[in-house]
């Protein structure tokens, strides 16, 4: 929106010496010292955290209004309202009086000058950091891809994703998907599409969460992000262009609230699928179909029309079998799926006392068994029997008719109890390799020896107590090495650490598919 408060609030010099040292994206809040979601005041250059960290940037604005309310405003006070601030990671500008993002500038273009100065500071800090690391590596006998920093192993080749304000749920999913090899390779090999018009060509576009633009492509921005994550040219990538498109086409995820990573993943895959079906990213429908032809036709699972890489990789088919307990009539229904949501069995959900610590541990097999076991539907789910002509008691059982190349398993850790959505914090043991899905197949005799074996590719973990709070990180394996992705920080880790994680979403890749990808 056009903000009328810029002239009275943007008072700092673009190259102000008052700015802190170091890269702007890692600046700390002057109150709580948090480096998450830093915002710089464009009146006094002080740095505070965003409203969904500890809210000190907003409090800074509110505190500045008290003298103006208690005293007659002087000309000097009119100019010092501390109303406008800038995100130190995405460089978007926000006005607290308008309570919205700002798209205009002052007559002298001060906002853009501050933005460019912050970008230069970020680039300088990054260049200095790379030079320092390169020098250390030259003098080190360690692996050329690794560098020991403060006792942890930092990955040089992997790229983190900057947190743009409680966007860790998006970052964890993006990092996980970038390590599903066949899926990632497909997007990286798509031709690039330039969406900017002549007025903005050659200039970086700074999107805000309230801007409107009909000419956007989720596929194109997703492709750019995947290309940036493993090119090794930077330690952290700022995905504001992708997030702008996400915020535009998926309004549920606008703002700075913490969101559910699984819900975001489903929305993302669904919208990628729909856009690829229509060829909206500038690639013709025939070109997309030609790309898809490289994937085995027998492994495609259509959801809402023609198959795409989304359904070819993640698509499976469930058989839902319902039996009437009165007349014995059997009803079968086939449902396509992109992921399976598994309950954690109730016997494992209660908190254990110290003397119960050595009791049985919940395993992924327990969750899969609970999902596929025969169950009697309760009174609220009576089945409409076409033979009996009325709702009857019945049993239900799921079979997997077709397994996907990438099996996504979502553990249902959040449950509604009364008016609260509580988290099930139970540890679930899961295999890092050799997950055998054969016993859950409808026709296991028709499957090949390795077609039912899956190896773990990525894990999304939720840290905290509630879906609307906490923090998301991801573990993923790349070229045989496990990495931990915590927003902009990427560290090398080991299998033991991964195995101890309290998984929320597990991504498994078919062993046959992985072997095929390695041959390409």
Curated annotation (Swiss-Prot):
Both protease activity and an intact zinc finger are required for H2A monodeubiquitination. InterPro entries: Papain-like_cys_pep_sf (IPR038765), Peptidase_C19_UCH (IPR001394), Ub_carboxyl-term_hydrolase (IPR050185), USP_CS (IPR018200), USP_dom (IPR028889), Znf_RING/FYVE/PHD (IPR013083), Znf_UBP (IPR001607). GO terms for biological process: DNA repair; DNA repair-dependent chromatin remodeling; protein deubiquitination; proteolysis. GO terms for molecular function: cysteine-type deubiquitinase activity; histone binding; histone H2A deubiquitinase activity; histone H2B deubiquitinase activity; zinc ion binding. GO terms for cellular component: chromatin; cytoplasmic ribonucleoprotein granule; Flemming body; nucleoplasm. Gene3D superfamilies: Cysteine proteinases, Zinc/RING finger domain, C3HC4 (zinc finger). Belongs to the peptidase C19 family. USP3 subfamily. The active site is at 168 (nucleophile), 471 (proton acceptor). Residues 159-511 form the USP domain. The lineage of its organism: Eukaryota, Metazoa, Chordata, Craniata, Vertebrata. The keyword Ribosomal protein does not apply. Zn(2+) 1 binds at residues 3, 5, 95, 98. Zn(2+) 2 binds at residues 29, 32, 49, 56. Its main location: nucleus. Its EC number is 3.4.19.12. This is Ubiquitin carboxyl-terminal hydrolase 3. It catalyses: Thiol-dependent hydrolysis of ester, thioester, amide, peptide and isopeptide bonds formed by the C-terminal Gly of ubiquitin (a 76-residue protein attached to proteins as an intracellular targeting signal). Interacts (via UBP-type domain) with H2A; the interaction is less efficient than with monoubiquitinated H2A. The modification N-acetylmethionine is found at residue 1. A zinc finger (UBP-type) spans 1-121. It comes from Mus musculus. Keywords: Acetylation, Cell cycle, Chromatin regulator, Cytoplasm, DNA damage, Hydrolase, Metal-binding, Nucleus, Protease, Thiol protease, Ubl conjugation pathway, Zinc, Zinc-finger. Zn(2+) 3 binds at residues 41, 44, 60, 82.
